[in-house]
Amino acid sequence: MKTSELIKLLKKSGCRLVDHGKEHDKWYSPKTGKNFMVPRHGHKEIATGTARHILRDAGVE
């Protein structure tokens, strides 16, 4: 999964961007009440386990 695809899913589920970092962005999920980091590495694929963990923290999966 690419970062852009992941961000679309996060926005659809109601998550919001909290802060930009140098290589990662900090997001907040109102469903879970958690803050979580999303890597911002251009058009590269995000590892499957990393994407699964981010989606779980966001309350999407």
Give residue spans per PLM region:
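Basic nucleic-acid-binding interfaces
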Residues: M1-H20, Y28-E61
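Positions that flank functional sites
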Residues: D25
